């Protein structure tokens, strides 16, 4: 049995995500089966946002198979950097909280987020100086991020760089993409390179030249090539055809770029690669 004592007000889903990566895999299933208890009382099937108060006791059971599933792996670590490879369905905050608990006073610094429904690489700093340098590098686009996506049809050219404009729709928790500038919209630039085509889908490398909320998924859908399995911006018929309810998107590679006077200069040019691929479509991990 997993048991947690709440120390500050939160809702059930966010609390579970931030405390137990394993439960992130199975939260919906546990909730539907009413296997989560708060202070000994079973939570209703629709109670993911149940408010928790300090002192509340949350408990649930995971099977041995569920316990053994890997929420994330550490793929690289030195005195300054830590790189993890997380599974889809795992909240990024849960990865951070787990690392922080394991390392105690040594700790880690949260640098960037990765959506719960996206698999792949996350990088953490292990001290304040390197955290500041990494945050600067991400902000100034000195960190090169490459994604792998399964998309509808994809592009005829070997590689294409596309420009559009993205505006947030806070009321609907989504974004809108258009081909022309508009009030409140920001310019986005995304590169797409098909590496494998199979019928009406293709596996593509995707390069973020700007980094905005939902940029890859929304931009791809705007161009008529939605990401397979995307339930927000995707093609419902295509998702149903392939039986996909989770987006086929992986944060595949991270390449670091630092100048000679940087505390991370030794890592300049270093590339990290996720173990995940789309083997079912012939795109193996590289």
What are these regions (language model features)?
Residues 161, 169-171, 180-195:
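Non-catalytic RNA-recognition surface used by pseudouridine synthases
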Residues 1-172, 197, 281:
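RNA pseudouridine synthases
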Residues 172-174, 187, 233-238:
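Short Pro/Gly-enriched beta-strand edge/turn motifs at strand-loop
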């Amino acid at each position: 049995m997993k048991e947690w004592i709440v120390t500050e007000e939160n809702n059930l889903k966010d609390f579970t995500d931030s405390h137990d990566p394993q439960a992130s895999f199975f939260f919906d299933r546990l909730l539907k089966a009413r296997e989560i208890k708060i202070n000994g009382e079973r939570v209703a099937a629709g109670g993911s946002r149940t408010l928790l108060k300090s002192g509340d006791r949350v408990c649930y059971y995971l099977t041995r198979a569920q316990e053994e599933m890997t929420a994330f792996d550490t793929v690289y670590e030195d005195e300054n950097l830590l790189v993890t490879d997380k599974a889809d369905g795992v909240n990024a905050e849960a990865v951070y909280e787990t690392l922080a608990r394991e390392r105690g006073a040594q700790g880690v610094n949260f640098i960037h987020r990765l959506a719960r429904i996206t698999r792949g690489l996350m990088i953490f700093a292990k001290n304040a100086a390197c955290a500041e340098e990494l945050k600067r590098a991400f902000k100034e686009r000195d960190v090169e991020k490459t994604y792998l996506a399964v998309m509808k049809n994809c592009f005829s050219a070997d590689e294409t760089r596309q420009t559009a404009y993205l505006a947030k729709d806070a009321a609907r928790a989504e974004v809108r993409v258009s081909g022309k500038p508009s009030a409140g919209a920001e310019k986005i630039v995304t590169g797409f390179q098909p590496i494998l085509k199979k019928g009406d889908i293709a596996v593509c490398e995707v390069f973020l030249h700007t980094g905005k909320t939902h940029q890859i998924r929304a931009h791809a859908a705007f161009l008529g090539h939605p990401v397979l399995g995307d339930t927000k911006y995707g093609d419902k018929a295509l998702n149903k055809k392939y039986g996909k309810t989770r987006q086929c998107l992986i944060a595949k590679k991270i390449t670091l770029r630092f100048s000679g006077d940087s505390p991370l200069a030794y890592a300049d040019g270093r590339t990290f690669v996720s173990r995940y691929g789309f083997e079912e479509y012939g795109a193996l991990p590289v």
